[in-house]
Amino acid sequence: MENQSLKSELAPNWAYRGQSFANLLRMGHCAPTVMRSILDISSMEKEWLVRLSAGMPGGIGNTGYECGGVTSPLVLLGIHDGLRQVDGDLPVIFDKGYALCQQFIACHQTLRCKEIRGKDRFPRHCIPPVLLSPEIFMNVLDGDHGQAIPAGERAAYSRLYAHLVENEFHCAQAVLIHLGYSPAEDPELFDAVSAFIGGTLFMGKTCSAFTAGVMAVGLRAGEIENSIPRVIRLLTIMTVGGNAFDESINKFNQSMNRGYRLAKWFMKESGSTQCQVITGCDFSDPAGVSNYIENDRLTRCKLMASEFAEKVQQMLADESQRVPL
């Protein structure tokens, strides 16, 4: 997807951009800012979603992969549609999520945080994705995107999705279940992670079990930054090359740093945080899906989800009570 040449035709919405900029000045990190901005624009009171995104800045636990300007809108598409709304053989979140990613790439040429931010100390390249993501989300939310996924890829995705449903497995939801959540008691939480399957909508990107663990860290123990002076200090420290991610600098830093520590453990155990690298399968290709199914790669995915949930639980052992939604 990231090699496709697409033209951005997004009409600017200055009210959305103004709201996003105001939130960015108070919060300082991408994923929580985008989450807060879309919640504000949608008049939704769900602060738990901001906590859920607390560890996601820097490309999911500061690993440099999917930008927070993508992951937060995908969470909110899940809240809107879950896996309940189905178009043919796939939930509509695949159509909408794919369309959202296409539009994001049209604006920013990539989904990857590290490619967007570059090597500049001051994160000036991160500002446009934060400002534009809410209007991309709103543009995608109620549209018809049934043709967004090319037919060949859609057939491959449909076969893989049927295989996972038959085996009652969803990467992100499996981690949540191991952490003590349940679809019956926490339906919105399970909806929120709908897109995080097969490395984000079967795109083979960041392992969705890992993503769910980082989200759980934020949900259970995350704090929310809301201070312009503290964000100015954060940016100043970044610009001069200091340790801007010290946990005393910004309240989101603790969750992000925990996510990064989880990433180091995950990479040691699995060799990568990237689904396609771990599985050795390209899910957009029917041959890749056949490889995954016929060689029973699912068994390893189930084991990884279980073991990673145990690691997350260890990290949060001092957090004895669940944070209510």
Where do the language-model regions lie?
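Short glycine/serine- and small hydrophobic-enriched flexible loop segments
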Residues: 36-40, 75-82, 135-139, 177-181, ...
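Acidic-glycine-rich active-site phosphate/pyrophosphate-binding loop
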Residues: 3-9, 34-54, 107-110, 175-194, ...
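Conserved phosphate/anionic-ligand binding catalytic regions in large, soluble enzymes, centered on
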Residues: 64-72, 200-215
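A short glycine/serine-rich beta->alpha loop
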Residues: 17-25, 56-64, 118-123, 158-166, ...
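Polybasic, low-complexity association/targeting segments
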Residues: 1-26, 131-167
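Gly/Pro-rich interdomain helix-loop hinge
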Residues: 82-90, 220-259, 267-274
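Ordered, small/hydrophobic-rich secondary-structure cores
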Residues: 39-110
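C-terminal binding/interaction regions
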Residues: 95-155, 250-325
